[in-house]
Amino acid sequence: MPLFETIKHTYKHLWSDASTASFRKYPSPERPDILSIDILSKEIDPTTGVLKCTKLIICKGNTPSWLKSILGSGECLFYEETTVDPKNKIMTLKTKNLNFTNILGVDEVCTYEQHPDNEEWTLFTQEATVTSSIFGVARKMEAFCLDRFVANAGKGRKIMEDTIIKVQKEAEESLASFDKTFTSIKHEAEQSFEKAFSTAEDILPIIKLDDKQSQTTQNTQSNNNKKK
């Protein structure tokens, strides 16, 4: 019979920051067992704006000797499907193991959604289902995997918090850089305008003088013609 575990956590950060951080939280020194994450496909629905992404995750199997003798391989492969709905502010990640499926099944579903009580917070729900069919050690294997799930979930929350702060800091720095650039351009434009205006003020008397001299010349020529 499968074992289940559900964990809920509130991140006191905007959904946009949390969902962005979810894509960027690995690699992390807190989880050296996660060896690689490769994006297999990515597409955005032009009508709904929903992003769908698939990944291959390879983890180092830090398993006890009794479990290693059953599984054999030292690496675990996982397939993950991610769906991000920016309009409804919900992100869903579904993960399942690709190897050892005849011995052990691990399915995980994570959701990030705007908190129902505070739109500036994010509600995170993490659910795991572990199933084993090995006679005699099935329950022991399932319990071990769930314990590992709970331990890794705690590490994952810390990694998320750190990554969210990093995302927010980068956004602030980008905004500050934009403001600095905009201010610099505005200042240069004002200086150019002032210079052009100052030049115009210097040239205007000369133009007026040239016009006056030209008019005088024309009047003189006109008088001379009349005398003739």
UniProtKB/Swiss-Prot annotation:
<dbReference type="InterPro" id="IPR006797">
    <property type="entry name" value="PRELI/MSF1_dom"/>
</dbReference>
<dbReference type="GO" id="GO:1990050">
    <property type="term" value="F:phosphatidic acid transfer activity"/>
</dbReference>
<feature type="domain" description="PRELI/MSF1">
    <location>
        <begin position="1"/>
        <end position="172"/>
    </location>
</feature>
<comment type="similarity">
    <text>Belongs to the slowmo family.</text>
</comment>
<dbReference type="GO" id="GO:0015914">
    <property type="term" value="P:phospholipid transport"/>
</dbReference>
<dbReference type="Pfam" id="PF04707">
    <property type="entry name" value="PRELI"/>
</dbReference>
<dbReference type="InterPro" id="IPR037365">
    <property type="entry name" value="Slowmo/Ups"/>
</dbReference>
<dbReference type="GO" id="GO:0005758">
    <property type="term" value="C:mitochondrial intermembrane space"/>
</dbReference>
<protein>
    <recommendedName>
        <fullName>Protein slowmo homolog</fullName>
    </recommendedName>
</protein>
